[in-house]
C-alpha cells in the first residue's frame, strides 16, 4: 500500500514558465537573424519533469532567434504531457518514456529529442552509506527494494542492522518511474514505497530522510552548475555485472559529466537510460512548433550536456526529422 505525501511548496506542484515577446528593446533586436525574423505564434508544452529543464533552455535560446514567438511550459509528469497532447490542450507533450501503441493509435506522434537517465538516490547521511556505495544496486536488489521486501538495512545489505529502509516512489504517472521499473522487469503501478509527487518531490523527500532511498532523473539528482549531486543527495551506483561490488569501470557517479559520458558510451544500462520525447497529436502544422522541433534536433543539441542530458546520435535525429515530412 502506498502512502501519499504532497510537497505543495515545491514548484507549487507544477513547474510553469512563460517566455513572452517583449515590446521593449532587447539584445535580440541587435541580432541580425532575430531582427529580420518573421516567425510568429505560440507554442505550449506540458509534461515530464525529466524534459522540463532542457525545454526551458531550448525555449530561451529559440526566443533569441525568434522573439515574436510566445512559449508556455508547464510540468506535471509524462502522463499529463501525453494526455494534454492527445487532447490538443498543448501543442507538444513532454514524455520521458516510449510511446505506447494505444497512444499512437490515438494520434500520438513522438519525436525523440534528447537522452537522459534515471538514477537511484540516497541521503548522504545514511548510516550505511559507504556499504551501499561499495555494493551498489543490482536489478534483483532494486526489484526487492521497490516491492517492500527489505524492512531494514540489515535485510538489504546482509549485515547486522535494525535501521529501517524508507523507499520513495512517484505518485504521478511518469516516465521516470516507468523506466526505472522496466529496468528490473516491473511497471510503475507495481512499485511500492512512499509515493511522492514529481521529481522535485522525491529528491526533497530523500534529502530530508537520512534513511531514505529514491530515484530521480539526472537533472534533479545533480546540480548542473557544480555538476555535483545536490546537497544531501548521492547517487547509488548500479552493479551492472552483478558481481556483488562496484568495480572501477562502474564508478562514474561523483559528477554529472562522468555519468553522462558513461551513458553515451553504453556503460550505464538502457533502461534506466532512455530517449525523451516531444509528442504531438498527428504531424504538427503550426510553423512555430515545426521550427522548434527542428531547432531542438539541430543547434539545440549543443546545449544538452551543459543542461545535464546526452545528445542524440545522428541516426535518431534523422528519424525524428523524417516524421515532420512523412
Feature map (PLM): residue ranges:
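Flexible loop/hinge segments at secondary-structure junctions
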Residues: 19-326
Amino acid at each position: 500500500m502506498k502512502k501519499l505525501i504532497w510537497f505543495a511548496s515545491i514548484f507549487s506542484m507544477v513547474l510553469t514558465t512563460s517566455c513572452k515577446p517583449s515590446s521593449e528593446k532587447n539584445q535580440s533586436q541587435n541580432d541580425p537573424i532575430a531582427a529580420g525574423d518573421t516567425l510568429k505564434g505560440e507554442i505550449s508544452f506540458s509534461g515530464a519533469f525529466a524534459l522540463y529543464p532542457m525545454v526551458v533552455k531550448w525555449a530561451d535560446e529559440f526566443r533569441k532567434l525568434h522573439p515574436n514567438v510566445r512559449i508556455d511550459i508547464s510540468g506535471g509528469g509524462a502522463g499529463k504531457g501525453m494526455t494534454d497532447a492527445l487532447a490538443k490542450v498543448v501543442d507538444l507533450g513532454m514524455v520521458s518514456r516510449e510511446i505506447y501503441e494505444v497512444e499512437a493509435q490515438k494520434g500520438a506522434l513522438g519525436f525523440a529529442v534528447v537522452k537522459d537517465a534515471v538514477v537511484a538516490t540516497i541521503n548522504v547521511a545514511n548510516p550505511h552509506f559507504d556499504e551501499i556505495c561499495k555494493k551498489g544496486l543490482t536489478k534483483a536488489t532494486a526489484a526487492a527494494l521497490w516491492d517492500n521486501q527489505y524492512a531494514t538495512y540489515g535485510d538489504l545489505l546482509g549485515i547486522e542492522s535494525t535501521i529501517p529502509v524508507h523507499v520513495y516512489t512517484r505518485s504521478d504517472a511518469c516516465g521516470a518511474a516507468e523506466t526505472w521499473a522496466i529496468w528490473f522487469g516491473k511497471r510503475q503501478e507495481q512499485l511500492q514505497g512512499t509515493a511522492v509527487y514529481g521529481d522535485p518531490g522525491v529528491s526533497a523527500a530523500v534529502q530530508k530522510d537520512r534513511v531514505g532511498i529514491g530515484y530521480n532523473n539526472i537533472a534533479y539528482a545533480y546540480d548542473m552548475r557544480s555538476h555535483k549531486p545536490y546537497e544531501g543527495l548521492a547517487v547509488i551506483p548500479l552493479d551492472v555485472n552483478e558481481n556483488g561490488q562496484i568495480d572501477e569501470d562502474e564508478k562514474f557517479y561523483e559528477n554529472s559529466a562522468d555519468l553522462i559520458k558513461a551513458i553515451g558510451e553504453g556503460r550505464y544500462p538502457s533502461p534506466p537510460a532512455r530517449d525523451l520525447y516531444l509528442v504531438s497529436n498527428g504531424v504538427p502544422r503550426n510553423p512555430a512548433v515545426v521550427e522548434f522541433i527542428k531547432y531542438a534536433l539541430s543547434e539545440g543539441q549543443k546545449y544538452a550536456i551543459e543542461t545535464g542530458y546526452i545528445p542524440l546520435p545522428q541516426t535518431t535525429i534523422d528519424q525524428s526529422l523524417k516524421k515532420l515530412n512523412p
